[in-house]
C-alpha cells in the first residue's frame, strides 16, 4: 500500500531534479524512508487521534496528581508511551503529503528539502490542532497548515535576499529555530532561549532578528499556479482564525462534491443562484434568461435541490458545519 505512492512520488521528484545531483540523492533517500509507513484511511486516523488524546490526558494526570499509586503511575506511563507511538505513526503516514505539497513550490529559490522541512513543521502544527470529533479527514485538514508553513518559510527566505552572504545562513537558521520553539513552547521564545538553542551569542540575536524583519513584497505570487499573492497567506489581527480558515476551505470542498451529485442543470442553477463561483448571486429572472426557463421554473428547481440537500447522505456530509 505504501510502496506504490512512494515510487510515483519519487518519479515525479526525479523529473524536477538533476538525476546526478546530491539534492536528488538526498530526496530519494528521504522518500524511500518515509515510504515504509502505510497510508491511513479515515478510520485509522481517528483511531490514532484517540490514542494521542489519551496519551496527553495520561501525561496531564501524571504531572498534576500527586497521590497516584505505583501501579496507576505505570498504567498511565504506558498510555503516554502509546500516545507518543500513535503520534509518530500519524506523522510518518503523512510525510508523503508534505513532499507532494512542497514539490509545487519548487523553482522559487528554495531547495526542495528546505520546503519539505518547513512543510513538516506545518504538519506537526496540524497534529496539535486536529480535532477528530469534527469529522474531518486529517490529511485534508493538514493540507492547509502545511501550505501555510511552506509559504511562511519562503517569505522568511525572501527577506534575506539583500543580506550579505555570510549573514543569510545565520538568519535562516534563527528564523527556523524561532518557529520550532514557538510550536514547542506555545509562545514566542525569549532572546535568551533563542541564544541557548541556536548557540548564537545573545548580543547578536537582536541584530539577526532585525535583519530578518527586512520588508518583503506581499505581491509575490505563490501557489502551484501562482494564483495568489503572498499577502493572502499572512495572518493579521482582523483575519479569520486559522481554524475557521481550514473549516471554510473544507466546507467549500464538500459543497462542490455535494453539488457534483446533482444533474447538470440543477448544479448550474444553484451555483448561479448563490454566487458560488464569483460571490455574486443571480436573481431568478437572470438565471431564467440564461437557461431559457421561466422565473417560476427556476424557483421550482431551487426548491427541489434544497429539499435534496436537507436529507440523506448529502445532508449528513454538510451537517457537521452547522454545529
Swiss-Prot record:
Annotated region (Sigma-70 factor domain-3), positions in chain: 169-245
Chain positions covered by the region annotation Sigma-70 factor domain-2: 90-160
Keywords noted in UniProt: DNA-binding, Sigma factor, Stress response, Transcription, Transcription regulation
Inducing or repressing factors: Expressed in exponential phase, peaks at 10 days and decreases after up to 50 days in culture; induced by detergent (11-fold), heat shock (23-fold, 45 degrees Celsius), low aeration (2.5-fold) and oxidative stress (2.7-fold, SigE and SigH responsive). Seen to be induced and slightly repressed by 10 mM H(2)O(2). 2- to 6-fold induced by starvation. Its basal expression is largely under control of SigE, probably via MrpAB, although other factors including SigH also play a role. Half-life of about 2 minutes.
Listed GO biological process terms: DNA-templated transcription initiation; positive regulation of DNA-templated transcription; response to heat; response to hypoxia; response to xenobiotic stimulus
UniProt xrefs under InterPro entries: RNA_pol_sigma-70_dom, RNA_pol_sigma70, RNA_pol_sigma70_r1_2, RNA_pol_sigma70_r2, RNA_pol_sigma70_r3, RNA_pol_sigma70_r4, RNA_pol_sigma_r2, RNA_pol_sigma_r3/r4-like
Entry keyword DNA-binding: yes
Any single GO CC term annotated in Swiss-Prot or TrEMBL for this entry: plasma membrane
Domain of life the protein comes from: Bacteria
Sequence motif Polymerase core binding, residues: 114-117
Sequence segments annotated as region (Sigma-70 factor domain-4): 258-311
Pfam families to which the protein is assigned, alphabetical: Sigma70_r1_2, Sigma70_r2, Sigma70_r3, Sigma70_r4
DNA-binding region: 284-303
Region annotation (Sufficient to interact with RbpA) ranges: 1-228
CDD domains for this protein: Sigma70_r4
Null mutant phenotype: More sensitive to SDS (cell envelope stress) and hypoxic treatment in vitro. No effect in human THP-1 macrophage-like cells, intravenously inoculated BALB/c mice or aerosol-infected Hartley strain guinea pigs.
Molecular function, one GO term: sigma factor activity
Residue ranges of the region described as Sigma-70 factor domain-1: 25-59
Function: Sigma factors are initiation factors that promote the attachment of RNA polymerase to specific initiation sites and are then released. A non-essential principal sigma factor that responds to cell envelope stress and hypoxia. Controls a regulon of about 40 genes, with another 100 genes expression being altered during SDS stress and about 50 gene being altered during diamide (oxidative) stress.
Protein name: RNA polymerase sigma factor SigB
Organism: Mycobacterium tuberculosis (strain ATCC 25618 / H37Rv)
